[in-house]
Amino acid sequence: MPLTHLNEENQPKMVDIGDKETTERIALASGRISMNKEAYDAIINHGVKKGPVLQTAIIAGIMGAKKTSELIPMCHPIMLNGVDIDILEEKETHSFKLYARVKTQAKTGVEMEALMSVSIGLLTIYDMVKAIDKSMTISGVMLEHKSGGKSGDYNAKK
């Protein structure tokens, strides 16, 4: 399969999506941040001096989805219909799993917006708690599901 982001001279280009059909596009991405018990408890008990960590991560994730095309060179700017973020507490492993669901009606998908949303949300948690635990790890950022468009649906293997 040829790379569509290269022209005949192998130079970068942005793919022309002008002839594509506008359809509903949905993408769901996820990722996890793991930390020590002290940092986890500080977040849960609202004891982080920088403020409400999980609420701030949700707002940052929404902003990340909206700014994706400004940071990913070949990503088209598209109007988003919605961004929903859920953060699950994983007490046993002192982790949080962040899910971002992005929806649009456009000529291109929102996979990158969902992945960016997760990444920025998790990085925000790291930033707000790094004074307590610098050894936090972000892992497993992945596309869980996508629907719409010419390539059809995708579901990650569990």
From Swiss-Prot:
Active site residues per record: 127
GO molecular function: cyclic pyranopterin monophosphate synthase activity
CDD domains: MoaC_PE
InterPro entries: MoaC, MoaC_bact/euk, MoaC_sf, MoCo_biosynth_MoaA/MoaC, Mopterin_CF_biosynth-C_dom
Pfam families linked to this entry: MoaC
Enzyme Commission number, as recorded: 4.6.1.17
Alphabetical keyword list: Lyase, Molybdenum cofactor biosynthesis
Alphabetized SUPFAM superfamilies for the sequence: Molybdenum cofactor biosynthesis protein C, MoaC
The reaction(s) this protein catalyses: (8S)-3',8-cyclo-7,8-dihydroguanosine 5'-triphosphate = cyclic pyranopterin phosphate + diphosphate
Domain of life: Bacteria
Top EC class of this enzyme: lyase
Family membership: Belongs to the MoaC family.
Protein purpose: Catalyzes the conversion of (8S)-3',8-cyclo-7,8-dihydroguanosine 5'-triphosphate to cyclic pyranopterin monophosphate (cPMP).
The protein, known as: Cyclic pyranopterin monophosphate synthase
Provenance organism: Helicobacter pylori (strain HPAG1)
Gene name of the encoded protein: moaC
